[in-house]
Amino acid sequence: MPVELVDEAGRAVGACPVAEAHRDPGKLHRAFSVLLFDTAGRVLLQQRAAVKTRFPLLWANTCCGHPAPGESVEAAAATRLAEELGVAAGLTEVGVFRYRAADTATGRVEHEWDHVLIGTLDTTPHPDPAEVANLRWVRPAEVRAKLAAEPAAYTPWLAEVLEIADAAYRESAGR
């Protein structure tokens, strides 16, 4: 599957295979990270499956992925939610950030222009075991504490996704 390469301002500049984009030193490309909330304000974290080529078995946001070149992040994120968790949720883009992280265990690199989307979920997810090892609903404050205490158990992008998503959720919920 190709990913959309972007420049320093997030503008599309081309495409390449996903494996090539994640080969060291990494090519800057468009990605998305979804964080779903329940009605109590908890966030749904997933433990990435052992077969993932980047950061396997680490805890991450609800789901993430890459839109195809020219595809909207909202459409791609909705597709991934259905594929990975068997759920649908209304999604809102609430921010974007750039990061680069090398996975020393796999030799792969994430260099992403990451769009953050949030939504609420009031149904039970049905994770695909090829994508997701485990799921957990956690209060944002607890996630922050665990990120500080055990950073190696979490993906390098989770802290930034959580900050952007939680601020937007609290603002929209009047909390």
From Swiss-Prot:
Q: Which InterPro entries match?
A: Idi_bact, IsopentenylPP_isomerase_typ1, NUDIX_hydrolase-like_dom_sf, NUDIX_hydrolase_dom
**Which pathway?**
Isoprenoid biosynthesis; dimethylallyl diphosphate biosynthesis; dimethylallyl diphosphate from isopentenyl diphosphate: step 1/1
Positions with a binding annotation for Mg(2+): 64, 84
How many cofactor units bind, and how? Binds 1 Mg(2+) ion per subunit. The magnesium ion binds only when substrate is bound. Binds 1 Mn(2+) ion per subunit.
Binding residues for Mn(2+): 22, 29, 66, 110, 112
Q: Name one GO molecular function term.
A: isopentenyl-diphosphate delta-isomerase activity
Any Pfam family from its record, for instance, is: NUDIX
The answer to keyword Protein biosynthesis applying to this record is no
Where, by residue number, is the active site?
Answer: 64, 112
Q: Which UniProt keywords apply?
A: Cytoplasm, Isomerase, Isoprene biosynthesis, Magnesium, Manganese, Metal-binding
Give the EC number(s) listed in the UniProt record. 5.3.3.2
HAMAP family, A to Z: Idi
- Main role? Catalyzes the 1,3-allylic rearrangement of the homoallylic substrate isopentenyl (IPP) to its highly electrophilic allylic isomer, dimethylallyl diphosphate (DMAPP).
Q: What is this protein called?
A: Isopentenyl-diphosphate Delta-isomerase
